[in-house]
Amino acid sequence: MRLPKLLLILCLCAAGPAAADPLDDALAASRKGDYATALRLWRPLADQGNAVAQYNIGYMYDEGLGVPRDDTAAVQWYRKAADQGHARAQSNLGALYERGEGVPQDFAAALQWYRKAAEQGHATAQYNLGIMYGTGRGVPRDYAAAVPWYLKAAAQGLAVAQYNLGVLYGEGLGVPQDFAAALLWYGKAAEQGYPRAQNNLGMMYARGQGVLADYLQAYKWFGLAAQRYDESEKQSRDNALRNRDVAATRMTPAQIAEAQKLVQEWKPRSDGSKP
């Protein structure tokens, strides 16, 4: 099974409601693109041990926002925040260890930092920990061990984790094969606009796996997938279009028109939770 690329969510971290004014002022400046002011305000706080400021400076170096991109500096600042239990810093530090950016590549260290963040409920870290088990990075490949972490991330609405669960249930990897469960998880990711899930959901409707065969629904999901693949995924988009056209051979003109209308009217929706 080919799993998607690692998903790294990097976002500037706001302080809580009782935060000191400089944190809020720095965040406001960063949102306006005034990274020099943000860095000037965050730096003394970070030097005093403020984990939020440390994380945000790490992010600026990670992304090259207002400073030259510097993975080594990003690692240093993320580590300061991570050592204080900052979950996003732990997750991003794990990703840098996994990719070998700013530090020598070290899957064991990546696993350690992902786990720290995952145990705090960080959805991206939970997903990445599942990836580590599912691909055998730093640990023996173990789909069964990946499943609980994907479930935790999926329960928080992370579409790529929902998609991976669909794959595992559909293929019977780490869990008994269960087309109904695969359909459920593909559906959750598809409704959020994740194109791989949309294509696979279309395939399940076309094949009648976990549901009665429904070519109208298959056409709809194939069509939506084709629309949402980006330019770097031309082959996947072309495959979705071919799948849609095959489904169309089993449909009446009226059904095709109805399916096309569904595609036009469809809008992605959140499942009500955020990672």
Regions found by a protein language model. Give the residues of each.
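Terminal, low-structured helical/coil segments at or just beyond the last alpha-helical repeat
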Residues: 227, 233-275
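N-terminal signal peptide c-region/cleavage motif recognized by signal peptidases
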Residues: 15-17
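Hydrophobic face of amphipathic alpha-helices that form TPR/SEL1-like repeat modules
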Residues: 22-29, 41-45, 56-63, 67, ...
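Short helix-capping/linker turns of helical repeat alpha-solenoids
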Residues: 29, 33-34, 47-50, 63-65, ...
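Sec-dependent signal peptide recognition
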Residues: 2-9
